[in-house]
Amino acid sequence: MARSGLDRIDISPQPAKKIARVGGLQHPFVKTDINTINVEHHFIDTLQKTSPNMDCRGMTAGIFIRLSHMYKILTTLESPNDVTYTTPGSTNALFFKTSTQPQEPHPEELASKLTQDDIKRILLTIESETRGQGDNAIWTLLRRNLITASTLKWSVSGPVIPPQWFYHHNTTDTYGDAAAMAFGKTNEPAARAIVEALFIDPADIRTPDHLTPEATTKFFNFDMLNTKSPSLLVGTPRIGTYECGLLIDVRTGLIGASLDVLVCDRDPLTGTLNPHPAETDISFFEIKCRAKYLFDPDDKNNPLGRTYTTLINRPTMANLRDFLYTIKNPCVSFFGPSANPSTREALITDHVEWKRLGFKGGRALTELDAHHLGLNRTISSRVWVFNDPDIQKGTITTIAWATGDTALQIPVFANPRHANFKQIAVQTYVLSGYFPALKLRPFLVTFIGRVRRPHEVGVPLRVDTQAAAIYEYNWPTIPPHCAVPVIAVLTPIEVDVPRVTKILKDTGNNAITSALRSLRWDNLHPAVEEESVDCANGTTSLLRATEKPLL
């Protein structure tokens, strides 16, 4: 199989001037001056030059505007300031399967040349090349001017896209305070290791890459992670086995999503997502690390430490509930059978055994939230509790519940009103555009950890489970800088993909059409002043139509 034009990554800390492999994408996995590229200016310029009435051959203008914009960024990276970040000609090879293209393609030109299969091939290559996410400078560049799954706002009437979304650099998430976000960023590798060791079904992993009779290489994508993994084929050990890059909505080109953990086969040559014919579903996981439960196990005055000790000594559902309910605002919110859940927590329950004194219900549900509440109400979560680590062996194990099982089913499910659910719904929508025939299985992972004791500091902890043995030479490990795992909760989520698809597709297309008409009018009438919304801080000001907001 021929390799794509962008199938290699250089992880050298210094920008590479010499191209190691012909046809390969080269860029350092560090913050560099490529971030100074005026992404916003070019994107708005592309919008201004695009007719709202362009012929898209049954597709939408937004996707071709996005592709034209990405083409400009990638070709700019081929030679900025005499330093090569991507292979000269690789962008044309990716877009047009040729090394030459006379000039930057206009969206209408792309609409006349690219098929739906071409678009998916290009965007799947971009996803593969942007794994590493925040450590990947290209991920950061391409994510600008996108409405992302983690930043899209929702109102009672549905998703809300600001009128001037094209001015907004969507580079940071907006959920939670800075301390909570820092805790999540620090401990996400620990949660990822737990997902790999406990949550991923071995049946999802042991799937052959090559099913065709002419295939000569027979191995499994995830069997030999240090020798034949697609992660190494793209050149960086910092890319995890199930890591996902930037997925751009193939329907509108407006929305982007980067999944925390994606279990899907990849092409062994290019690293692009490539489910084999035997796959019927794709699992992905959104990780949330709960900073508000962080505690010192040796602090006798901390009630979390006391309830944690009780839970470890007597692992029952009642003691688990007591631990979770120890803090003022627990991660599980109770609502009565006749009440509605509030928006406070991502996990909810209406089970009488989980009733909490002083609970407050929420306002009336939107029709979509009520629908998703019905879909998820009968779903249960599974919980794993961890023993204290064995420092001599460098391992950590899960406790056995009274039933003898390592996981406990609890009557807790996802809250459709919470921002985490909305984020996962958007991720599901974006991923479904690439693989419409496959069942998508999203999960919310809740990680709770504790402070390390002095003798535990600096010790990596291998997650010692039977399932983890399939990883052989790359056993899932809690990095030494992470908290010691205490509890992990796995919550399946059911999303009505057709309904969410219609809502988000219509919203995205309307936002694109509105932007095209607005900017085209501004371009033709530069002296007109109008009220403009600064999406960065929500303020309103009068701006000349030819000026951009100061972000």
UniProtKB/Swiss-Prot annotation:
Its EC number is 3.1.-.-. Keywords: Endonuclease, Exonuclease, Host cytoplasm, Host nucleus, Host-virus interaction, Hydrolase, Nuclease. Coiled coil: none annotated. Disulfide bonds: none annotated. The record marks E188, D260, E286, K288 as: Required for function. It is found in: Host nucleus; Host cytoplasm. GO terms for cellular component: host cell cytoplasm; host cell nucleus. One of its GO terms (molecular function) is DNA binding. Its main location: host cell. Pfam families: Viral_alk_exo. Interacts with major DNA-binding protein; this interaction increases the nuclease processivity of the alkaline exonuclease. Plays a role in processing non linear or branched viral DNA intermediates in order to promote the production of mature packaged unit-length linear progeny viral DNA molecules. Exhibits endonuclease and exonuclease activities and accepts both double-stranded and single-stranded DNA as substrate. Exonuclease digestion of DNA is in the 5'-> 3' direction and the products are 5'-monophosphate nucleosides. Additionally, forms a recombinase with the major DNA-binding protein, which displays strand exchange activity. Belongs to the herpesviridae alkaline nuclease family. This is Alkaline nuclease.
